[in-house]
Amino acid sequence: MRFALTEEQEAIVATTRQFTEKELIPHEERVEKLGEVPPDLVKQIKERSIAAGIYACNMPAEYGGGGLNSFDTTLVDREFGATSYALHYIVARPSNILRACKGDQITEYLIPTITGERVDCLAMSEPDAGSDVRGMKCTAVKDGSDWVINGTKHFISHAD
């Protein structure tokens, strides 16, 4: 059995490779020296990845995402692997957990995240559990219109 990418998949690879070489790799040295990605660079990369059709490529097309399947999204990830994770994480796409949005959650969370107006965060790591989700102790409890978080988190991705 011979395996080959379709023309569309080859175009996905070429677009992502070109984006990575032009928009990400040139900033690697600066980001590594700073130890962070400056906010202006985050904004620039996000805007350009949206324009290139790469941002939210894993989200449903019916809500403005790219509609790529898991395999095609992996092709995008493979090309991003040529650069610093700190840089390609900016365009690493919204979390797949957003696919579970229903009803009002779609307009409140999913669509604004797909368009780049909102950022999804991941707060998984804890002092006594690391990133073992079964060992997590932190809880979030609804209190009126607010949420009360009880516990401690580390390494909250996109929390800035």
Q: What residue spans do the PLM features occupy?
A:
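Glycine-rich flavin
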Residues: 25-160
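A non-catalytic, amphipathic alpha-helix used as a structural packing/dimerization or gating element
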Residues: 8-22
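Intrinsic disorder at enzyme termini
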Residues: 1-12, 140
